[in-house]
Amino acid sequence: MILKAIRKVIDGADLTRGEARGVMQAIMRGESTPAQVACYLVALRMKGETVEEITGSAEAMREAATMVITDVDGLVDTAGTGGDGASTINISTAAALVAGGAGVMVAKHGNRCVSSKCVIADVLEALGVTLLDDPKRQAEILESVGFMFLFAPFHHKAMKHATEPRKELGLRTVFNVLGPLSNPAGARRQVVGVYDEALVETMARVLGELGAEQALVFHGAGGLDEISTIGPTKIAEWTGSSVDVYQVQPADFGIEPATLNDLAGGDSIHNAAAIRSIFAGEVGPQADVCLLYTSDAADERSSVDLGGR
């Protein structure tokens, strides 16, 4: 199947949702060679991935995942694509923890280093959190605490068949956007930052196709895969039936514009210390962006409109 798909994509034709799903299923089962996987990923990247192709690929990822079964209603995920190269503090991680502490049920899906010098797994370990690979225990913690981190390699073991081709390519591919679309706890309310403005509306439509109840997808000034307090943020909101696209500014929320340097991160120890400072009540640009992101996560849970639109 993958060879047929490669030929079709090289000729500039789009795959159907079913075709993309079938190719990804074959990759997840280890039925494609590393060379075939690499060729497919590059061909798809050069053509440009469509909503149908991303949706089908995400469906295959979900099917192959080790799921966390829980009765918790209204789960929210704040996973983003990473890969913006900005090396900020872990904004979505801090926001997820604040939202969880405020009563939002957060199933945060994530991995290790992508856009920051450390990502959620690294900073949570620096904060003393143990990464769990027991879905039953994860469900228990989520239900009792209101927050659980779902470490992607524990839940998407079939991804091992694409690891080496991706590593050797060193390019962004469709896999870079599949993480936020493949939450192992089935979160249907999402706040998703993307590394490319061109992906904002596309990802919102994909989330709608995948059954999301509500979603905010955004790309911020400074090239951030985050809500930005540096300048304008482009947002695509999946309302449950349609996609609304708009832009917000820091001033809309009464926030003073920040600089990229204000939000700069470091290694896991540095970022963990920054998060502790925010939690201790320190005010400033890092706290501002954390609270703004948190309000978006809370809005996804409570169906409150994004303030200042």
Task: Tell what function each PLM region has.
Residues 305-309:
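Hydrophobic alpha-helical segments, chiefly the membrane-spanning helices
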Residues 80-85, 110-116, 155, 221-222:
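Acidic, glycine-rich active-site loops and adjacent beta-strand->loop/helix elements
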Residues 4, 8, 14-15, 63-66, ...:
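Glycine-rich anion-binding loops and their surrounding alpha/beta cores
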Residues 41, 89-145:
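A glycine-rich phosphate/pyrophosphate-binding beta-strand-loop-alpha-helix module
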Residues 1-88, 106, 257-261, 275-283:
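Acidic, glycine/proline-rich low-complexity segments that act as flexible tails and inter-domain linkers
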Residues 36, 91-95, 119-120, 199, ...:
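Catalytic-loop motifs flanking and including active-site residues across diverse enzymes
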Residues 293-300:
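Conserved small/polar residues in nucleotide/adenosyl-binding loops
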Residues 40, 83, 124, 179, ...:
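Residue-level signature of catalytic and energy-coupling elements of molecular machines
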